[in-house]
Amino acid sequence: MKWMIASDIHGSAFYCEKMLKAFEREQADKLLLLGDILYHGPRNDLPKGYAPKKVIELLNNIKEKILCVRGNCDAEVDQMVLEFPIMADYAMITEAVSYTHLRAHETGAYL
């Protein structure tokens, strides 16, 4: 099983779309989101392409492929619109992990 790991979308449809294109291109089976999905936080500027409603739509379209851990900018109200669980502070994954010496820039495995 191939996992893609991402975090800190902060409501940016621009970066969410880039992430989902990489998810498709890399043919990953699951997407592990490490929080901060919709809100940008009170101390941060609005990210490029800030459109949380669009992010909701994009992520709900692949909800069965997402495992999410709550970030510091995620709130209970976010769970009302996202169709996959986000409120757990932790999750247990029982998958084998392999390590490689290839760097992301050598394989093109980056956004």
Where are these regions (language model features)?
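Conserved small/polar residues in nucleotide/adenosyl-binding loops
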Residues: 100-107
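Core catalytic region of metal-dependent phosphoesterases/phosphodiesterases
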Residues: 2-96
